[in-house]
Regions:
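Active-site environment of divalent metal-dependent phosphoester hydrolases
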Residues: 33-35, 61-71, 91-94
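Aromatic/hydrophobic pocket-lining residues that form π-stacking "cages" and hydrophobic walls in ligand
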Residues: 47, 70-73, 160
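Extended substrate/RNA-proximal surfaces in nucleic-acid metabolism proteins
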Residues: 2-17, 23, 76-163
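An N-terminal RHG(E/S)-centered segment typical of histidine phosphatases
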Residues: 18-21, 32-34
Length: 163
């Protein structure tokens, strides 16, 4: 399997740091500033910085119906030996919130495109829900998502289960 470069780098540093670790510390449900429920301070740099301060070995970025901030977090975290599992909190047609985790960034981004086609499009109102910011690894906003990401998708739970 072809591994993403940032995943390989993080795994190598994690292996060095935890060669005799009996346990790993992790948080597998983190929202960034892309999620409407996330704070504007939840930038890639702040997520990675807090993970390092807390001594986390593994984190997963799981924004609502999007994986677009995973690349920046993965790039930064690899420098600290923190393994990032790219993910998404998908909202099904039944309003079930399912945390989806991926072995590779490429798989996450492919799923992101698939889910976006299934997202019920409703314009985001920044005055109510806040900005939905797409960031780079320098914590610079490189775009915003115009459609509200906390909406459900047309994807049923059964369809998700079968993927």
């Amino acid at each position: 399997m072809n591994r993403d470069a940032h995943t390989v780098q993080a795994q190598e540093k994690l292996s060095e740091r935890c060669s005799d670790c009996a346990t790993l510390s992790y948080d597998l449900h983190i929202h960034s500033c892309l999620s409407p429920c996330g704070d504007d301070d939840m930038t890639p740099g702040n997520i990675v910085g807090m993970a390092a301060i807390k001594g986390l070995d593994v984190i997963a970025v799981t924004d609502h119906n999007s994986c677009k901030n995973c690349p920046a977090v993965m790039k930064l975290a690899a420098q600290y030996g923190i393994l990032v599992i790219p993910g998404m909190e998908l909202t099904t047609a039944e309003e079930v919130h399912a945390v989806c985790l991926f072995p590779e960034l490429s798989a996450a981004l492919e799923f992101d495109r698939f889910v976006y086609e299934k997202l019920i499009k409703f314009p985001n109102r920044e005055d109510i829900f806040g900005k939905q910011q797409i960031m780079n690894e320098e914590d610079i906003c490189i775009g915003t998502e115009p459609n509200l990401l906390i909406n459900s998708t047309t994807l049923s739970f059964d369809e998700l289960w079968d993927i």
